[in-house]
C-alpha cells in the first residue's frame, strides 16, 4: 500500500525483485537441491529454467496483483524485456549467474511515463543474446537505480540488511550513501 501511495502522490517508484525462497521451494518440489556459493545460488541450465519460471511468472505476477489490489497500476517486466539488463557470466562455479554490464532503462522510463509502477524480475539477457542469466536482485536494483539517476534507493529484504561480510551479522551497515555502494560490491 505504501508503494501505491507514493505513486499516487507523484513519486516514481520502481520495484526490482528476486524470489530466493520461492525458487528454493520450487526446486525442492521437483527434487533438485539448492546450492549456494558465497551467498549466490549456483544456477545450472535446469535451475535457470525454474528461476525464470518462478521470477518472471509466479513472483512477478503476484507482486503486480498485490499492487493492483491496493489500487495501483503495476506492469510486470523481466530484465530481458527491452534489453533492460545485459550481463556476462560471473564465473564457471556459479553457472548461469551473471553480472550486469549494461542497463538500457528506456522500457522502465516508458512505463513510468504512463503512470504505471514497473515491477522488474532480476533476469538478464547475455550480451551476446544467446542465454539469460540469474542476477542477484539487490545488484540488479542497484544498477537500475544508478541508470535511472534515482534520488532514493530503498532496499526491502528478508535479511537483516547490507553487511560488510554476509556471514557476520555484526557487520551490518546501518546507512550508506549511493556513492559508497559500488565500493561495497
Residue ranges and their predicted role:
Residues 1-185:
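Nucleotide/pyrophosphate-binding catalytic subdomain
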Amino acid at each position: 500500500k505504501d508503494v501505491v501511495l507514493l505513486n499516487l502522490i507523484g513519486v516514481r517508484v520502481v520495484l526490482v525483485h528476486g524470489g530466493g525462497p520461492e525458487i528454493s521451494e520450487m526446486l525442492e518440489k521437483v527434487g533438485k537441491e539448492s546450492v549456494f556459493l558465497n551467498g549466490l545460488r549456483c544456477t545450472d541450465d535446469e535451475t535457470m529454467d525454474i528461476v525464470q519460471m518462478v521470477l518472471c511468472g509466479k513472483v512477478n505476477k503476484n507482486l503486480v496483483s498485490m499492487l493492483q489490489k491496493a489500487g495501483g497500476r503495476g506492469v510486470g517486466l523481466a530484465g530481458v524485456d527491452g534489453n533492460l539488463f545485459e550481463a556476462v557470466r560471473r564465473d564457471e562455479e556459479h553457472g548461469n549467474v551473471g553480472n550486469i554490464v549494461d542497463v538500457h532503462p528506456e522500457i522502465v522510463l516508458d512505463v513510468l511515463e504512463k503512470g504505471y509502477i514497473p515491477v522488474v524480475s532480476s533476469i538478464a539477457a547475455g550480451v551476446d543474446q544467446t542465454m539469460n542469466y540469474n542476477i542477484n536482485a539487490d545488484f540488479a536494483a542497484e544498477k537500475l537505480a544508478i541508470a535511472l539517476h534515482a534520488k532514493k534507493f530503498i532496499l526491502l529484504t528478508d535479511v537483516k540488511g547490507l553487511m560488510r561480510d554476509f556471514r557476520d551479522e555484526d557487520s551490518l551497515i546501518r546507512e550508506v550513501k549511493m556513492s559508497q555502494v559500488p565500493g561495497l560490491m
